[in-house]
């Protein structure tokens, strides 16, 4: 089948007569040579480019097109932003400004590299058992090349058994690399099955080196902390606020855009008493407390709250963080409630409580525009201000921040 790609779907795939064409661009003339059915969708598994779209650029990553990490790296960045604006208009029904990421390479502060007999890298798109071998990850930056080189030497010299995904065998499974972009501190976490990890300090001189053991049957890139070398935490800094990073704690993955995110949230809040729901490690709450707001935060994750309390201490601010689920917390008496839920959106009980107890302002931070649109329809509030931030260049994902009154 021959034709011209006219549009992308919401996942960033080109569409040609009902067939999804990954890594294509609007304006590409292509020939589809093979089609497979994937989860009830027809996907071009093999196609040939006849004439290139003017929207195309040369991807910086050599693994682009096979690696499942980036899907839009072949599109110029201005068009990536336009694609996200169009996507938001379709979902929300109105135009939303998309703030560009300050950096579009070297912006990610975390990557989880699988370590297998076939290579070190990320899963091939659509193939959980297959790893694309890489030398570096351009969206993370130059530290990734250094870490991968040292890892290969570590494995070879110490004769370490690595992962066979299909057989679920092998000792060393993942290397998780994290970096404070504003502090230049680096952490590496080796995730293994039961066994003994040789001393990595002869090969790695990063600020913090961890060894974690995944004792579950799940394929996850974290586990029980066995031991660490160097610093217990690394730090990231957003403006004048420091945050501790631990292997088992979450932090916004684009530090450069996270600065714009916390600044925007601080612009939108009103009053003095702030409730920080889904607070995590206190990213918003501590930034606001540093600016004199009276902050109380809640999260259902006990370790996240432990980290939030540590962040309170190192920043010398006055803020409280407690463990509680979104179904339990009263929002009464707060001037502004910040909600930053997981992709599933707000729990229905929280929606009812917000409608009943009526805080003056809700600042809604969302990584899923579709659940955001659903929740806003259920809330007895209107959108006073909204902006999108491109936290995830080269992917179809986008972050929303809205003030509801």
Curated annotation (Swiss-Prot):
The keyword Acyltransferase does not apply. Contains a N-terminal TRAM-like domain, an iron-sulfur cluster in the central region and a C-terminal catalytic domain. The tRNA-binding site is probably formed at the interface of the three regions. Keywords: 4Fe-4S, Iron, Iron-sulfur, Metal-binding, Methyltransferase, S-adenosyl-L-methionine, Transferase, tRNA processing. It catalyses: uridine(54) in tRNA + S-adenosyl-L-methionine = 5-methyluridine(54) in tRNA + S-adenosyl-L-homocysteine + H(+). GO terms for biological process: tRNA methylation. This is tRNA (uracil(54)-C(5))-methyltransferase. Activated by magnesium ions. CDD domains: AdoMet_MTases. Catalyzes the formation of 5-methyl-uridine at position 54 (m5U54) in tRNA. SUPFAM superfamilies: S-adenosyl-L-methionine-dependent methyltransferases. GO terms for molecular function: 4 iron, 4 sulfur cluster binding; metal ion binding; tRNA (uracil(54)-C5)-methyltransferase activity, S-adenosyl methionine-dependent. Pfam families: PabTrmU54_TRAM_dom, tRNA_U5-meth_tr. Its EC number is 2.1.1.35. InterPro entries: MeTrfase_TrmA_AS (IPR030390), MeTrfase_TrmA_CS (IPR030391), NA-bd_OB-fold (IPR012340), RUMT_ARLMC_TRAM_dom (IPR048845), SAM-dependent_MTases_sf (IPR029063), U5_MeTrfase_fam (IPR010280). It is an enzyme of class 2 (transferase). It comes from the Archaea. It comes from Pyrococcus abyssi (strain GE5 / Orsay). S-adenosyl-L-methionine binds at residues 252, 278, 283, 299-300, 326, 340. [4Fe-4S] cluster binds at residues 61, 67, 70, 137. Belongs to the class I-like SAM-binding methyltransferase superfamily. RNA M5U methyltransferase family. The active site is at residues 367, 399.
